[in-house]
From Swiss-Prot:
Its cofactor is pyruvate. Binds 1 pyruvoyl group covalently per subunit. GO terms for cellular component: plasma membrane. It is found in: Cell membrane. GO terms for biological process: phosphatidylethanolamine biosynthetic process. The modification Pyruvic acid (Ser) is found at residue 186. This is Phosphatidylserine decarboxylase proenzyme. Its EC number is 4.1.1.65. Pfam families: PS_Dcarbxylase (PF02666). Belongs to the phosphatidylserine decarboxylase family. PSD-A subfamily. The gene is psd.
């Protein structure tokens, strides 16, 4: 935060600048018109806010990649590689983001980006669980140990038709780091190994980079945590 203003994600700069200019022009025409145009400017500023987070510093913890509400948890088979058709069992944790949530996405666990793919699809409302299978999405595979991966999906919604992912193959990433954003309401799925201890439940509100989704080592549940502010 600087000068009392909230941190703003750079993806929102153009929206906010245009809205601000329109608002200034509107005020020059009439006070009432200016006040009316001020509302979307404030709304854009609020939507693209990017607050710092206290990230738990523990390599065994899988953190929430997004703010929102857990809409579904289920065990699934996921095709890990398009080349050989390999499938593995994962636990899917699906997070719905409303337009009021912070939409900046964060890395759930430290590791290396092993695979990335962008899949075209529909723009079903993100409130529907159908969006996980039918909608346009960015798929990210993170290898946290040799041969062990988790998968993150950024999913577009009815309004959110712009997925931003600032990652590359073989890039080293750290838990809690910002890696992208989905504009105006969306869904983020995270697939964790099926034998992992899931620490959240359906209907629970989660915070990106802070809420613990799962623990890779059940013996470390009571371990004292330290935090990095990112």
């Amino acid at each position: 935060m600087c000068f009392g203003l909230p941190n703003i994600n750079r993806e929102g700069y153009s929206f906010i600048v245009v809205s601000f200019i329109v608002t200034c022009i509107a005020f020059s025409i009439s006070w009432g018109f200016g006040v009316t145009c001020l509302f979307p400017t404030l709304l854009c500023t609020y939507f693209f806010r990017d607050p710092a987070r206290a990230v738990p510093n523990n390599k065994n913890l899988i953190l929430s990649p997004a703010d929102g509400v857990i809409s579904k948890i289920e065990e699934v088979n996921y095709p890990l590689s398009a080349e050989n058709g390999e499938e593995k069992k994962f636990t899917l944790v699906s997070i719905f983001l409303s337009v009021l949530n912070v939409h900046v996405n964060r890395i759930p666990i430290s590791g290396t980006i092993k695979e990335m793919s962008y899949k075209k699809g529909k723009f079903v409302s993100a409130m529907s669980n159908r969006s996980s299978n039918e909608n346009e999405k960015q798929v990210i595979v993170i290898e946290y140990e040799k041969g062990k991966e988790i998968i993150v999906e950024q999913i577009a919604g009815l309004i959110a038709r712009r997925i931003v992912c600032n990652l590359g193959i073989s890039q080293n990433v750290k838990a809690g780091e910002r890696f992208g954003i989905i504009r105006f309401g969306s869904r983020v799925n995270i697939y964790v190994p099926a034998d992992t201890e899931v620490r959240v439940s359906e209907g629970q509100t989660v915070i990106g980079g802070e809420t613990i989704i799962a623990n890779l080592n059940k013996e470390n549940v009571q371990e004292k945590l330290t935090f990095d502010v990112i």
